[in-house]
Every structure is written in structure tokens, then in C-alpha cells.
Amino acid sequence: MLDANQGTLAASDSRLNGKKLRIGIVQARFNEPITNTLAQACKAELLALGVAEKHIDLVQVPGALEVPVALLALAEKLEYDALVAVGCIIRGETYHFELVANESGAGVSRVALDYQIPIANAILTTENLAQAIARQTEKGRDAARVAVEMANLLSDI
């Protein structure tokens, strides 16, 4: 079985140098205790990777389905090197979970491809609150690292 950290870079790797980058974060407020922790962990990691605080913008939207339209608005500004989608969808008793998870994920991917901008997707999709709590900090940090690495990669291509 593969370790969850397989494929991660050392913090000293130049691909994780965020000093010249501008990053936008879109946070869904639904399940806010989880999404607050995700966003805080993401921002803390961006700062640790050298992204200046003044170059990190955070906008909030009601829920995961609204994340793609806010990402689109940020992408259209052409001011960001990468974006991060933050949200939390916890399975309930209805089909709504699948709808929200699938549509928000597809929307995030569409914006990334249409605007050729890296978007780290930290919209958690979990079976229960305990799974979300267990992942909230690590996935926020992971999203920051993905955003910085992909922004640097695209600038080098």
C-alpha cells in the first residue's frame, strides 16, 4: 500500500519556492469549522513557502457549488499564479452529496483548464465528520504545496 506522503517534495525544493507568487483561495463556508481550518492551514503553509501575505487573497462563498464561479472570477483577473479551492462535503442520507461533489469538482477542473491556471482542489468529500476533522489540516497544507509547485511548473514550461 502506498504512503499518503509518497510523491511529496522537501520544503527546500526550489519547486516549492513561493516568493514571487500570488495565490487566491476560495473558501466555502458550509461546514465552516472544517473549512476555516483548511483555509488557515493552507495560508500558513503558503507563508512558510515564501508567499507574501499581501499576495494571498481569500474570498468566501456559501458552499462548494459556488466555489467554481468565484474561482472563475479570480482567474479572469489574470492576476494569480495559482488558486486553491477549499470546501467540505460530508455525505448525508440523500443523493445531494454526489451531486455537490461531482459538480463542484467538475467546475474546479473546468476553470483550471479553460484559464490554464493551476487550482489545488482542497474540497474534502468525506463519509462523516470524523473523516473531515482527520484531514482538515493536512489537506490544507497539501493544497498550498500543490498550488506553489504547479504555479512554478507552468511558469517554467
UniProtKB/Swiss-Prot annotation:
Q: Which reaction does it catalyse?
A: (2S)-2-hydroxy-3-oxobutyl phosphate + 5-amino-6-(D-ribitylamino)uracil = 6,7-dimethyl-8-(1-D-ribityl)lumazine + phosphate + 2 H2O + H(+)
Pathway(s) where this gene product acts = Cofactor biosynthesis; riboflavin biosynthesis; riboflavin from 2-hydroxy-3-oxobutyl phosphate and 5-amino-6-(D-ribitylamino)uracil: step 1/2
Q: Which GO terms describe its biological process?
A: riboflavin biosynthetic process
Which E.C. number(s) belong to this protein?
2.5.1.78
UniProt-listed SUPFAM superfamilies: Lumazine synthase (SSF52121)
Keyword match Transferase: yes
**Disulfide pairs?**
none
What is one term from the GO cellular component aspect held by the record?
A: cytosol
Keyword Transferase listed? The answer is yes
Which InterPro entries does the UniProt entry name for this protein? LS, LS/RS, LS/RS_sf
Q: Where does (2S)-2-hydroxy-3-oxobutyl phosphate bind?
A: 93-94, 135
Keywords from the UniProt entry: Riboflavin biosynthesis, Transferase
* Active site feature: 96
Which residues does 5-amino-6-(D-ribitylamino)uracil bind?
30, 64-66, 88-90, 121
Source taxon at top rank: Bacteria
**One MF term in GO for this entry?**
6,7-dimethyl-8-ribityllumazine synthase activity
Q: What does this protein do?
A: Catalyzes the formation of 6,7-dimethyl-8-ribityllumazine by condensation of 5-amino-6-(D-ribitylamino)uracil with 3,4-dihydroxy-2-butanone 4-phosphate. This is the penultimate step in the biosynthesis of riboflavin.
As for family, the record states: Belongs to the DMRL synthase family.
Protein name per the record: 6,7-dimethyl-8-ribityllumazine synthase
Tell me the classification of the organism that encodes this protein. Bacteria, Pseudomonadati, Pseudomonadota, Betaproteobacteria, Burkholderiales
Q: Which gene encodes it?
A: ribH
